[in-house]
Amino acid sequence: MTVKATDNGHKATAHADTGARDAGAAETVESQRTDTQRSDVSAQSKPSHRTALIDVGGGFRAIFGAGVMDRCQEEGITFDHCYGVSAGSANMVSFLAGQHGRNHKFYTEYAFRKEYASFDSYVKHHNFANLDYVYGTLSNHDGEYPVDYEAFAANPTGFTVIACNALDGSAKYFDKSDVHYDDFNIMKASSAVPVACEPYVIDGVPYFDGGIVDPVPVQKAIDDGYDRIVLVLTRPKDVLREQKRDIAPARILRHSYPAAAERLLNRYATYNDEVALAKEYERDGRVLILAPDDLCGL
């Protein structure tokens, strides 16, 4: 009887220990589940960053931006949205189409042709840069180096092109829906340098180069909800624009497009102010500025 009672005591103790272990394990599992749920909620509550790329263009200096985008393709870097000004908008079409090296060929080979940009082109077409040749003859589906329009259209990245309304001097923000098969007119509008080119007409409205109205559209990107922005400048970032080069063209332009002439006359201040703003955002960690150290004669 004594031995039996002792055995029962051991069994009771064993059952108690097992129950305690089970209860502890259950408590641990529940604690882990709660921690996981908290982590999930925390992860969901953290906003994901929205990224944008801005290329300010700048004539042949825009080859710098072309190099940046080729490198992005090599590294598999993509963005949620792209903003292009003037030649920068053309760079981005090739980038969004995934055509590595295409822009480089335009700047290093085609740009030396008389049909591309020359005094002869100005005499014949009233445009120093023959925009129809660049964005039509060369770029259409039957052109020498066509845009892969299907790839461009399939790319989910958003796209904004900036131009200046020649009539009232306001900024026009075209989007991807304004680009069609063999229709790259918004790039022509954004690249029509005042006086050097006639304004490019879209839907009855004449447009000039976007660089005279919103040359560094960082605030536009911020207002659109993008909080991580790569800004491609084509001048050293501490080099300011000067007004003197725009005074004579603005005087000529004033006779036909006074509002655009006023924009051109004040472009230097607009550019300098927008670069200063971009530097402030860079200090906050919202903007990364990429700029050449030297213009190399361009």
Ranges and model annotations:
Residues A5-Q44:
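Intrinsically disordered, low-complexity terminal tails and inter-domain linkers enriched
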Residues V41, S45, S139-N140, Y271:
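N-terminal short beta-loop-beta anion/metal-coordinating cradle
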Residues P47-D142, D175-A189, V230-L233, K237-D246:
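Patatin-like phospholipase
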Residues A66, P215-V216, V275:
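Residue-level marker for well-ordered alpha-helical positions
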Residues F106-A117, L253-A269, G285-V287:
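Short, basic, helix/turn surface patches
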Residues S121-R241, E280-L298:
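Active-site-adjacent alpha/beta core region of enzyme catalytic domains
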Residues R228-E280:
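Helix-centered, glycine/charged polyanion-binding patches within enzymatic domains
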